[in-house]
Amino acid sequence: MKVAFIINDFDSMNLEKDTSVFLMNEAFKRGYDVFSFGVNDVTYKLNNIFAKCEKVNFPDPSLLSFTKENTDLQHLDQFDYVINRVTPPFNKEYLYLTQLLDLADIKCINPAQALREENEKLVILNFPEIIPVTKVTNSLDEIKNMFKEGCKKIVIKPLDGMGGKSIFSLSEFDKNINVIWETITQNGRKHVMLQE
């Protein structure tokens, strides 16, 4: 089987934290031919979508080290699966890519339309019975209300972040709650997620 991963640049990945590397490694261990390409590697022509891919090999699958070899332009319908792993922030190039993927007759594990329409942080709100107490707000009062409502600790995180960046754990008596709120919400201009 052949699987292609749409990723951010390998050189910018944190190999210890980036799930894409673990997914590629696991696919390789299972005998898949693993390829990767980026948002800017895509070409649409003659009603087909192509990408300048790199073949990814893991010489020792027990390690996260890998090798890459360039390939010719690959027709995306030749892959058994395509997995979009591009991380935020998303820009117009990413939006265009998802629209091109919609036009292609390919097996995309995470459909482009769903990626455009669903925020990965907000999608959990569809499952209130299995998530901790959660609020989405830009209000400092709501942060303080969570403590009044009985939460001992809360986690505050941006809706568009990834990789653990700008995530804070707060307790009721932290002296820097106001500063964290100002920073993460840009003084109330951005919504954030609060979780017990």
Predicted regions and their residues:
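Extended, domain-scale alpha-helical bundle/helix-rich regions
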Residues: I7-D11
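Phosphate-binding site of ATP-dependent enzymes
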Residues: L140-D141, F147-K153, D160-E196
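Extreme N-terminal starter segment of soluble prokaryotic enzymes
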Residues: M1-A4
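Short acidic, glycine-rich loop/turn motifs
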Residues: D60, P158-D160
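Generic structural signal for individual residues within well-ordered alpha-helical segments
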Residues: T43, I143-K144
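Conserved N-proximal alpha/beta basic substrate-recognition cap immediately N-terminal to
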Residues: S12, E16-V136
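Short, well-ordered coil/turn residues at beta-beta hairpins
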Residues: I6, I83-V86, P158
